[in-house]
Structures are given as C-alpha cells and as structure tokens.
C-alpha cells in the first residue's frame, strides 16, 4: 500500500509542474539575459590601471600601426667567433706572400703529397695557428682606428641665453639628435654630451642650459637650480662657445644678453679659448647689420674668434668645425668613436620625447614636468623597449597633456617613436605614461 501511495504522489507532482509553465516562453531567457548583462565582461581590458591612472594616459607604440620599411632588420646572423686575422698572419708566416699562381701551385703540391706528409703539415699548421692566437696583437689597425699616441681630443662647451640655438648647433655638428631643439626657452635642462670624431681628432660637445644675468651679475632664482651646473663647469672646457641670437638682438636688443656676452668676454682664461657665435644669421635680411653687431663686441679680449653661423641650416658651421679641429691637443679619446654608449642613447631617447612634448604642449606645463626614464631593455629579437614617465603636479595639467581620449599623448608618442627608430636604426617599443605626483 505504501508503494502505491508514493506512486500517486509522484504522478500528481509531475502533473502540477507541467501546468506551471510561464505564460511567456521567453521570460526565463530574458531573466538570464538581464542577469549576465549586469556582470563585468572579463575579456575586455579595464579602463583603470593598477596604479589608478586612466588607460588614456598611457601610450604604447605596440597598439599603433607604424611603418617598418625604413628600419633595417634587427636580426643579424651570428658572426664566427674565430678571428680571421690569425689565419692571415699564419698564411704570411707559413706560406709567405703568395701570388694567385703560387697559391695554385701550392694546392697542386699538397694534393700530390702522401698521407704522412699531409698529417705533418696539418700539425704544423695547427701549431702555427695556436702561436698566432697566443701572440700579442700586432700594430696593424683596422679601418678607422687610430693609435692612442696619435689621438687628439677637445672638450667644447656651448653656453648662451635661452633659445639661442645651442641645441640645434650641437645636433648639426654631431650629426644626430642629442639635445632637444624647440622654439621655447629653457629647452635644455642638463648637460648633453655629443661626440664628433673625424680622422685622428675627437671633439666632445657639452650643451648647457640657457644662462641669463640680472643687473647684479648673478643668475635668476627661478632657474638657479637648472643653470648651477652650467656655471660651475664653464672653466672646465678647452674651448667655450658663447652663442646668442643675432636676429633677435637686431630686432629687440636684450640688456641681459649684452651683459652675459660682455661678462664672458672681459676676463681672459689662459687655459681656455673662447669664441663668440652669432647664430641665426639666415633670418637677417640685411647682411650689413651683422658687421655692426660684430663691431659692437670686437673690443672684448677674451674672444679669440667671431663666427656668423646658422645652427639649424648649417651655414658657417664648417668654418667653426675646422677651427675646433685645429684646437685639439694630443690626448686619448674619451669616447668610443664607432658606437654610442648606452648612456648617450638614453639621453637621446629623453631629448627626443622632450622635444615632441615642447612642440605639442604649451605654456608652462613642459617645464613643470618630472621626466623619468623608467625602463630600458634590449629584447631578444633585437628591438629596444623604452618606458618613460611624465609626472605632473596638477590634475588640470595632466588632462591637458593626455588630451581627449589620449589623443595628445598619443601624437607625442607616435612622432617620438618614429624618430627614435630612425636615429637608432632599429625597432623601438616606446611606452609613455602620464602620472599625477
């Protein structure tokens, strides 16, 4: 009986469940759709980074299509570790200086020798190769190399008022970008080393921040920290180039610039030669006016020579370069003539980004930023990963620097990345992140 009762209960339950179906057959589906649509989509990236900054404030070059046609392949075949010079030295000592016919004759003789002679000859050749490897290197130098006792060197400092064209001249003479060049003042914030090597002579350029003098003869307090190193290093250079914008001087003379030129030209330094460079002569329409400016400063005894140049277009720079080459003294080179040091490349990466920043962001924002190189890593495929942070003290400045939807920092990053790839001739993965202090 109990079995029959339980069977009846099960039948009644099954009948009630079939009658309680929802009126709307899509009701359950709508419920599930509303439920899942309220959940976060975990496959899509979040708009907030781990440090709390918006994703719009980060530029990543890997997310932008960049033309690689002008960049050589970074993957190079592995070179043999054996020095071919040893083989050449052995051939000279073992076979002598053979002509083509002599080489053929030796080859024929070797082929006709018996096995024992071949074994002996191989042993002698192996011994000669080992001796050549153990010998001290001979005095023969590769192409472009100069003996240390024949090397000449010169350290050149370039100073002047802000926006005088010091960075442009440094970049033109060195042949690549080592300092930020912009129309804004106080573009250079630290000394940047550029190296020019020609023949047996190496010239090292030090580009310094713009210097100005008050009536008292001392630097202004608002840029005191920026120019402190420039003033302390003035007397350390072999040659000092004092530069000013001659076009601006003719249009609206600045008494502070005149004081700086006279201050540097009044007292002679027996251990240092000083030259006065009138830059941006290409902007002066009446060339006779240049002679008037030269006469204005001709009585300053510390200046050995006067040069009229255009650091941007290169006019007159050849004469200045030749003068500097002639002033070089016998001294070993301080920098590698064939490769840039990693420190120089790091400075170049900072200066390239800084120049683009000055071109796209106006007012006082670029000068209040803290610009840091956070990561510098060479990847396995030969490319270079560079990460820089731009730290601003104000939220309003951060919004201006980022732009709507990250458009401004994106434009800065794209232009800087393309120029870095061109300068370094390799693939560069540039990451720029704008942060709030």
From Swiss-Prot:
The keyword Thylakoid does not apply. InterPro entries: G_ERA_dom, GTP-bd, GTPase_Era-like, KH_dom-like_a/b, KH_dom_type_2, KH_sf_prok-type, P-loop_NTPase, Small_GTP-bd. Residues 186-190 are annotated as: G2. Residues 39-50 have a biased composition (Polar residues). The modification Phosphoserine is found at residues 111-112. Residues 39-65 are annotated as: Disordered. One of its GO terms (cellular component) is mitochondrion. Residues 207-210 are annotated as: G3. Residues 51-62 have a biased composition (Low complexity). Has a crucial role in plant growth and development, possibly by influencing mitochondrial division. PROSITE patterns: G_ERA, KH_TYPE_2. Belongs to the TRAFAC class TrmE-Era-EngA-EngB-Septin-like GTPase superfamily. Era GTPase family. Residues 279-282 are annotated as: G4. This is GTP-binding protein ERG. Residues 152-333 form the Era-type G domain. Residues 309-311 are annotated as: G5. Residues 160-167 are annotated as: G1. Residues 361-437 form the KH type-2 domain.
């Amino acid at each position: 009986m109990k079995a029959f009762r339980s069977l009846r209960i099960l039948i009644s339950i099954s009948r009630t469940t079939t009658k309680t179906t929802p009126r709307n057959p899509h009701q359950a589906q709508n419920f599930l759709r509303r439920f899942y649509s309220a959940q976060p989509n975990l496959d899509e990236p979040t708009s907030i980074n781990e440090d709390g900054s918006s994703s719009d404030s980060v530029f990543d070059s890997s997310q932008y299509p960049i033309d690689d046609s002008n960049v050589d392949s970074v993957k190079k075949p592995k070179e043999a570790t054996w020095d071919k010079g040893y083989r050449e030295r052995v051939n000279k000592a073992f076979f002598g200086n053979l002509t083509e016919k002599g080489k053929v004759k030796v080859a024929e003789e070797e082929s006709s020798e018996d096995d024992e002679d071949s074994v002996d000859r191989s042993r002698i050749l192996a011994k000669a190769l080992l001796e050549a490897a153990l010998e001290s290197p001979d005095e023969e130098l590769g192409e472009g190399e100069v003996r240390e006792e024949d090397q000449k060197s010169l350290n050149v400092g370039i100073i002047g008022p802000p926006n005088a064209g010091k960075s442009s001249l440094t970049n033109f003479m060195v042949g690549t970008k080592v300092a930020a060049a912009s129309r804004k003042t106080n573009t250079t914030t630290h000394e940047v080393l550029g190296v020019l090597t020609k023949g047996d002579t190496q010239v090292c350029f030090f580009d310094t921040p713009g210097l100005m003098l008050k009536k008292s003869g001392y630097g202004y307090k608002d840029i005191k920290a920026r120019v402190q190193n420039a003033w302390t290093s003035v007397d350390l250079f072999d040659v000092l180039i004092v530069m000013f914008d001659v076009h601006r001087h003719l249009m609206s003379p600045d008494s502070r610039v005149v004081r700086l030129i006279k201050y540097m030209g009044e007292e002679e330094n027996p251990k240092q030669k000083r030259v006065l460079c009138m830059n941006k002569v290409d902007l002066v329409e009446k060339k006779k006016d240049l002679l008037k400016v030269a006469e204005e400063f001709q009585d300053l005894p510390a200046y050995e020579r006067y040069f009229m140049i255009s650091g941007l277009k290169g006019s007159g720079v050849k004469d200045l370069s030749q003068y500097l080459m002639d002033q070089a003294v016998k001294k070993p080179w301080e920098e590698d003539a064939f490769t840039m040091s990693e420190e120089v490349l790091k400075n170049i990466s900072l200066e390239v980004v800084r120049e683009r920043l000055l071109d796209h962001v106006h007012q006082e924002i670029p000068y209040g930023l803290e610009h840091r190189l956070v990561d510098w890593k060479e990847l396995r495929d030969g490319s270079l990963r560079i990460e820089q942070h731009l730290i601003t003290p104000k939220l309003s400045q951060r919004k201006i620097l980022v732009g709507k939807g990250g458009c401004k920092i994106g434009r800065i990053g794209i232009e800087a990345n393309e120029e870095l790839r061109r300068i370094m001739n390799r693939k560069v993965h540039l990451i720029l992140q704008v942060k709030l202090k």
